[in-house]
Amino acid sequence: MSWKTYTVKEPTELTVSKYVKERFSLSSRDIQMMFRKKRVKVNSRVAHSQRALKKGDVLTLELPQDKDYGVDVEKGPITVLYEDAHTLVVNKAPFMLVHPAGQTKSCTLSNYIASYYAKKGVVHKVRPVHRLDRDTSGCILFGKTKEAQQYYTDELQAGRIDSIYTGLVEGRIDADGMVDVPIGVDPVFDNRRVIDEFGQSAQTEYTVLGYEGDKTLLRFKLLTGRTHQIRVHMEHIGHPIIGDAMYGTRNKPYTRQCLHASELTFVPYGKDEAIMITCEVGDNFGRE
């Protein structure tokens, strides 16, 4: 383990222990161990767990190493798009959950990534920075360390990670545009989202790329990151995503939801320059 230094950049009323727990998603046991072994300092002095932090304080700590992957290790195919010591970007296949949820404990992307780490002889908890819907394919970002995951979470919340999607929608759209309507949780089915004037603000830009008969191929840029945002917005303007069973209909000859995370732009943890990761739709949206 090595010491890491962070400056508290925002006003806070949290104690040192609460700040460290929230920022690095650590367990109470890990927090207690760190303070017991004097692995937390504030302004170069060993810190008490209940010390109040303030903006400008310099926090130095030794984070515990991962002891497991956080999910079951299961061999499966993954396509790596970018990797360094702190970061992993892969191409998620359609019909796959990013992380175990509910009754699904296996055959997820995270299970396969755990196997990928194990094969390389390293132990990292599998830490997805964001999610893609089960039927959506494309670029997805993982932080290998607690520090990298928190960095990317902060970057995402600050709008400094750009996500671009490619999608095929019903009907012909003649011009580029933007949908700017709030999204909330469906009052009946909590796994669905609906347009809701009291919901969270949501903005989706779209650019026309071309046409396939009476369908339009679009490039989407998310200005916000709400659950099912593109799918809900396109259904709202009368052009649902092809193959979207929840907000549209299944459409032959396409065998899956025609939405793909095609581009991700971000500054990697520990580096200064932004990179752009691209990933083409490899299966033509499963067209038969």
List PLM regions with ranges:
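RNA pseudouridine synthases
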Residues: M1-E288
